[in-house]
């Protein structure tokens, strides 16, 4: 493990008197404005032209521009939030979305323009760096970082500390892999705005995803905590946990066809593509992520060759349907899946139906006549599985049992020839059982061709055949492309002509694995050479170097714009991609290498100088395995008569056993709307700490979130908020327990005076399977006078039994007894009030590294008994 050395701490600032401390709570010491030459000529309003201009000025790659434009459309569609504080005062048409105050980033303070240098000198930042109080400094003035520096020893250890623009330029692969994976553009209106003016495509609900324990479900029904397949760094399929699902709105979509699979996706949704790279006289293949609209027909796209067989036995709930039928027959029902049972269910899907001769009778019929090779096999399986006697009729046999019909319906086997579907749980079965079901379907309504090299199945239900296609893909078989429609006509005795339509699906591959029981319908095996070559080469192209046992590549057959549809996207822990319909789809910059501890904070300062300015900083932190980093940000702005907007997005990935502490000292002037989205993904044994101080702004809406995705992950939020006259601090936290034995702690303190308003808004969610999780929430509010207000909006969602949860909330006023007691000890009333306030916020104030937030030392006094004055 590598650690950076400690440095000498700064001299303690001069202590304030108690009266100065209480007075300073209502003062703002950073409201001066410097000359604003750049801001005076900046363009107002938001449009596609503005977004394109921002991207062009930053010389960004095309994919980033498209991500911005997509986010702009999301922003325009999403309504303003009506919960929380009143945001009607934001005039998006009057905001300046990009102001460039200097043409290049300075490497030393002396290189900064004089007016900007004077601003940061007054904030004390140059002195902070000279005294080595911070490991690295970044200073953002208006829209861009104007100064950046990192300690040489940290740089030598591989620590990356860059502004987001430089991170995009110098580390495009890492940046593209992680940006927008924790907070997608469609998360909320202001995350979309941030992405647009500083992302991720979407799929339609027709995209079906294999979810562990649930089977094949629509992407619209996938939930956080679900486990789905994705491609790992070795180009093999493995399960990953879903962090979030986002309904991304109605968008134009393409229908793409590849390897007998179809998928609808937006043009900017990324897929894994095999492309050739010229290296001198040699050509090699490499896998890259590319948006669908940039992929040409004929290019090889990653597809699943087979889904890993990670399923087990499914136990059916004990049936209470031991109803005796008219023949005094008592049926019993299987308690778990088996090869025989699945073959029989497949046979029923193809050649079965239910009937109701009268209201007290139900019949389950199998249209397998006595001459059919599987007639006797089917009767034997029914008898062994259910203890049922059958009645043989001309067209097959029947079981007269209402209980049998009800049991089938409970498992999802119901409907007629045009409405039957495969239930989702079938896709959670072992391959052997799935292949047995396909075998039953072939025995009922299928046949073989080319001496067993091809199997065909025909049904009246196109949807059922699409279900079978997905099942075959998961088992490693190769369905062909579009279903073939077949129409037949027949003339009845009365002269009527009846027309019927059916659909045919052809399947190839190792068909000897399919569990057919009709001798003439058995498939033949594929040679090892043939099996290895499937999806590793196409029409003279050989990309075997990229293919693995579970992932291959096939040419994109076509893509067609099919109109606008509702779309969705999901994020998957660690993999950042997922398999849908058998196709692989995707979804300030700090990187700390494995084992490196940055014990001295990295620090960023954000300053708005221009009136009506919109500042949209983007922070991305990746703490690799076993590392530690502390990041501190401070914010100030001038006081103007009209409002400005600060809308930030902070994404943090905390790898196994790493730890991140993120401290914010927000001291915006009272004409700034501070609307921030902050979220961390925390993996096995890792820890995320949010230390949040909100002193300024007109309105703050900020709820730092921790998604604990690995076992023994920890999340903590410690926050303090102060609201004075004309201020509303709507703050809180979100904790999502997505793995077992995770723990979270929320401590929130707020003080309101002079008619100010504070609100705590929090969520603790413990998902199913997150057993052994623990959470504690404590939010306390202090009202200094009778005209201020405090509200608490806690939400707790527990979906697991073995959980420890504690919640406590208080709202109190400074009592006359407290003041009387302190004043009886010789303190004046104002001094007594200051002491009460300091004592109230002390548990959080002592965690704030105020020696690094020099611009706030006259508002939060830590040196006086470790408390806020």
Swiss-Prot record:
* InterPro entries the record matches: Fe-S_cluster_assembly_SufBD, Hint_dom_C, Hint_dom_N, Hint_dom_sf, Homing_endonucl, INTEIN, Intein_C, Intein_endonuc_central
The protein's matches in SMART domains, at most eight in alphabetical order, are given as: HintC, HintN
Query: Could you describe the post-translational modifications of this protein?
Result: This protein undergoes a protein self splicing that involves a post-translational excision of the intervening region (intein) followed by peptide ligation.
What are the alphabetically sorted keywords of the record? Answer: Autocatalytic cleavage, Protein splicing
Which superkingdom is the protein from? Bacteria
- CDD domains cross-referenced by the UniProt entry: Hint
* Gene Ontology process terms (BP): intein-mediated protein splicing; iron-sulfur cluster assembly
Q: Name one GO molecular function term.
A: endonuclease activity
In this protein, which residues make up the domain named DOD-type homing endonuclease?
Answer: 344-477
Family membership noted in the UniProt record: Belongs to the iron-sulfur cluster assembly SufBD family.
| PANTHER family the record matches | FES CLUSTER ASSEMBLY PROTEIN SUF (PTHR30508), UPF0051 PROTEIN ABCI8, CHLOROPLASTIC-RELATED (PTHR30508:SF1)
* Designated name of the protein: Iron-sulfur cluster assembly SufBD family protein ML0593
Native organism is: Mycobacterium leprae (strain TN)
């Amino acid at each position: 493990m590598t650690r950076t050395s400690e440095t000498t701490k700064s001299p303690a600032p001069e202590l304030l008197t108690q009266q100065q401390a209480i007075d300073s709570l209502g003062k703002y010491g950073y409201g001066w404005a410097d000359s604003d030459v750049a801001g005076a000529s900046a363009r107002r309003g938001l449009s596609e032209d503005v977004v394109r201009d921002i991207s062009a000025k930053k010389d960004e790659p095309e994919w980033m521009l498209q991500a911005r434009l997509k986010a702009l459309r999301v922003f325009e569609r999403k309504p303003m939030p009506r919960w929380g504080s009143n945001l009607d005062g934001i005039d998006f048409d009057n905001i300046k979305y990009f102001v460039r105050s200097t043409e290049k980033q300075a490497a030393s303070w002396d290189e900064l323009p004089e007016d900007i240098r004077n601003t940061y000198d007054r904030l004390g930042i140059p002195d902070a760096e000279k005294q080595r109080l911070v490991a690295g400094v970044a200073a953002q003035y208006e829209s861009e970082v104007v100064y950046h520096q990192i300690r040489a020893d940290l740089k030598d250890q591989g620590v990356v500390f860059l502004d987001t623009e430089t991170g995009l330029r110098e580390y495009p692969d890492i940046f593209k892999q992680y940006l927008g994976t924790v907070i997608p553009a469609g998360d909320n209106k202001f995350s979309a705005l941030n992405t647009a003016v500083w992302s991720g495509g979407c799929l339609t609900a027709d995209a079906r995803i294999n979810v562990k324990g649930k089977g094949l479900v629509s992407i619209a029904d996938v939930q956080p905590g679900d486990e789905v397949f994705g491609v790992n760094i070795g180009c093999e399929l493995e399960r990953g946990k879903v962090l979030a699902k986002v309904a991304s709105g109605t968008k134009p979509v393409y229908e793409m066809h590849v390897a007998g699979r179809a998928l609808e996706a937006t043009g900017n949704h990324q897929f894994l593509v095999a492309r050739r790279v010229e290296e001198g006289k040699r050509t090699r293949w490499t896998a890259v992520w590319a948006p669908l609209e940039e992929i040409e027909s004929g290019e090889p796209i990653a597809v699943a060759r087979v889904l890993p067989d990670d399923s087990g036995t499914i136990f059916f709930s004990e049936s209470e349907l031991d109803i005796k039928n008219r023949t005094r027959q008592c049926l019993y029902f299987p308690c778990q899946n088996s090869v025989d049972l699945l073959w029989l269910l497949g046979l029923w899907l193809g050649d079965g139906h239910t009937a109701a001769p009268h209201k007290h009778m139900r019949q389950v019929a199998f249209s397998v006549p006595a001459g059919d090779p599987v007639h006797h096999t089917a009767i034997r399986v029914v008898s062994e599985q259910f203890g049922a006697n059958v009645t043989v009729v001309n067209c097959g046999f029947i079981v007269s049992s209402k209980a049998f019909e009800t049991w089938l319906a409970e498992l999802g086997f119901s409907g007629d020839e045009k409405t039957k579907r495969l239930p989702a749980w079938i896709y959670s079965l072992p391959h052997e059982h799935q292949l047995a079901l396909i075998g039953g379907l072939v025995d009922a309504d299928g046949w073989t061709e080319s001496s067993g090299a091809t199997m065909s199945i025909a049904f009246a239900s196109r949807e059922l055949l699409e279900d079978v296609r997905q099942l075959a893909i998961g088992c490693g078989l190769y369905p062909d492309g579009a279903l073939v429609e077949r129409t037949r006509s027949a003339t009845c005795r009365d002269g009527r002509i009846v027309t019927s339509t059916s659909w045919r699906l052809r399947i190839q591959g190792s068909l000897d694995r399919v569990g057919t029981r009709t001798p003439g319908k058995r498939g033949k095996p594929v040679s090892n050479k043939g099996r290895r070559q499937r999806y590793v080469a196409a029409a003279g192209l050989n990309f075997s170097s990229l293919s693995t046992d579970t992932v291959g590549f096939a040419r994109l057959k076509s893509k067609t714009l099919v109109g606008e549809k509702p779309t969705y996207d999901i994020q998957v822990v660690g993999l950042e991609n997922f398999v849908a319909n058998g196709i692989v789809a995707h979804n300030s910059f700090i990187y700390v290498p494995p084992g490196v501890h940055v014990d001295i904070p990295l620090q960023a300062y954000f300053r708005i100088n221009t009136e009506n300015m919109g500042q949209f900083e983007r922070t991305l932190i990746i703490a690799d395995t076993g590392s530690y980093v502390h990041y501190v940000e401070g914010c100030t702005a001038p006081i103007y008569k009209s409002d400005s907007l600060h809308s930030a997005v902070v994404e943090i990935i905390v790898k196994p056993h790493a730890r991140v502490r993120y401290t914010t000292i927000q001291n915006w002037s009272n004409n700034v709307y501070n609307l921030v989205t902050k979220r961390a993904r925390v993996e096995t044994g890792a820890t995320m700490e949010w230390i949040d101080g909100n002193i300024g702004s007109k309105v703050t809406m900020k709820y730092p979130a921790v998604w604990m995705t690995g076992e023994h992950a920890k999340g903590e939020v410690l926050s303090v908020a102060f609201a004075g006259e004309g201020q509303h601090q709507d703050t809180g936290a979100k904790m999502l327990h997505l793995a077992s034995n995770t723990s979270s702690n929320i401590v929130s303190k707020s003080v309101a005076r002079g008619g100010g308003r504070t609100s705590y808004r929090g969520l603790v969610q413990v998902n199913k399977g997150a057993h052994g999780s623990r959470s504690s929430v404590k939010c306390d509010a202090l009202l200094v006078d009778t005209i201020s207000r405090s509200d608490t909006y806690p939400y707790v969602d527990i979906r697991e039994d073995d959980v420890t949860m504690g919640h406590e909330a208080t709202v109190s006023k400074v009592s006359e007894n407290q003041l009387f007691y302190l004043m009886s000890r010789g303190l004046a009333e104002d001094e007594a009030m200051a002491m009460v306030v300091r004592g109230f916020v002390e548990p959080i104030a002592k965690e704030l590294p105020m020696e690094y937030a020099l611009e706030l030392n006259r508002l939060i006094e830590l040196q006086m008994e470790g408390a806020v004055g």
